Amino acid sequence: MKIQDWVTSAAIGLGISLASGSVLAAPAACAGLPSQAALQTALDSAVAQNNGDLGFNMWATIVANDGTVCAVARDSSTSLTSQWLGSRVISVQKANKATDFNIGSDGRKGAFALSTANLYSAVQPGGSLYGLQHSNPVDPAVSYEGDSSLFGTASDPLVGARVGGVNVFGGGLGLYQSGGVKLGGVGVSGDTSCTDHMIAWRVRNTLQLDHLGTVGGVSGDPQRPDNIIFDITQTGNGGMLNPEGKVGYSPSGFGHPTCLNNPNPATLPKVQNP
């Protein structure tokens, strides 16, 4: 067979494979991270627990250290239109932030974890990270391509792509294996941002990638170092405008607003030690 014919045949074969929705091999960057099936199981389990939610269906995404999307899942018992479609890309955005702005045990001063929830106050005008939310934008040329019937399956068109994005409300967490070694991030979206955080936490715990016992954080709870912080209070002496148009202040600098049916983050599982 001539080289040109071989290339043509290979291209046709690849096209047929993609069109049929067959599961392609996991990207090399995803080695050591959970499969789509494992993510799906963890998501279904997490959604069934008490998360202070509105009862909406969810999306979840795992992203590798280099930003490669490794797995995307949605509620396994429903149709595509049974959850917010926009939350698919938001879950990727959260996972990408969770890997891009978390540090593993190889960091100069060791591991340090910030959930997306920890960034809400810090990125407001006057906050220490103001402007971060505008960096590393989602790539629209990648985010919305492909067969929508495959969204949330093992053949989701986003798998293997680098989508980018930074999100600054609850639902994104770093993934850490034993010893505080960071493997990537997980992002969850589909309900209130407070519920998204709760479900992401339970997903990470089920996947056994919550080895943060020696990892630094800002929550003030060493057993949950990157937990959501509800410390925004009303003040007339400066601070940020909240949705009610009143001025609020986060003493920690990393607080997150409360949500409808607000959950109790202190009930979340403790992280594991190395």
Located regions from the model:
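Flexible, solvent-exposed loop/hinge segments and secondary-structure transition points
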Residues: 26-274
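N-terminal signal peptide c-region/cleavage motif recognized by signal peptidases
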Residues: 20-22, 26
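Bacterial N-terminal signal peptides that target proteins for export
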Residues: 1-10
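Bacterial N-terminal signal peptides
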Residues: 9-19
